[in-house]
Amino acid sequence: MSRCGSLGLYAPNALPSLSLKPRSVKSPFCITSHTKPNDTLLHNVNKMRAKACDILGAKKTILAAQLGAVLATIDHPALAITGVNNQQELSSVVLDIGIISVWYFLVMPPIIMNWLRVRWYRRKFFEMYLQFMFVFMFFPGLLLWAPFLNFRKFPRDPNMKNPWDKPTDPDSIKNVYLKYPYATPEDYDLD
């Protein structure tokens, strides 16, 4: 027997009546002879099947609505216990964390390292304190960027092919890094 494509889930039927008169159930297929059934009987059977499919389709819709209501009810069960009713959605929290992480790890460390490079010997006490605090706050991001940022001008000797090569004449390379105790800030300009 066909179930008209049903899922096998039905809404409960009403309880039978408690009346005492017996019911006689007649089968819709009363075949008393071995001959071919007439057209009216086939027409009645087709109408019954169509009606059953319509009823089952309505039951499926009702079941889907009930299932949706149950899922909506158990979506946030902790709200009834904790009383937190205005919690942020997970998508907005993840988006905020992503924006802050990009700013913390990708945007600020190169800016801070360039600021340290440019103002290294020209800073006063307050600027040195600010630079220290920014380095302290953004230390993980600076550690990630440090191997990739190199502000020194390489190669210093035009004869060197790679920055890690040894120069042929080391005395010809101008060294400006050891002037600090007696240097003026202009001595450290990298032009």
Swiss-Prot record:
EC numbers, comma separated: 7.1.1.-
Keywords: Chloroplast, Membrane, NAD, NADP, Plastid, Plastoquinone, Quinone, Thylakoid, Transit peptide, Translocase, Transmembrane, Transmembrane helix, Transport
Catalytic activity reported: a plastoquinone + NADH + (n+1) H(+)(in) = a plastoquinol + NAD(+) + n H(+)(out); a plastoquinone + NADPH + (n+1) H(+)(in) = a plastoquinol + NADP(+) + n H(+)(out)
GO biological process: NADH dehydrogenase complex (plastoquinone) assembly; photosynthetic electron transport in photosystem I
Membrane topology: Multi-pass membrane protein
GO cellular component: a single term: NAD(P)H dehydrogenase complex (plastoquinone)
Role description: NDH shuttles electrons from NAD(P)H:plastoquinone, via FMN and iron-sulfur (Fe-S) centers, to quinones in the photosynthetic chain and possibly in a chloroplast respiratory chain. The immediate electron acceptor for the enzyme in this species is believed to be plastoquinone. Couples the redox reaction to proton translocation, and thus conserves the redox energy in a proton gradient.
Record's protein name: NAD(P)H-quinone oxidoreductase subunit L, chloroplastic
Name of the gene encoding the protein in the UniProt record: ndhL
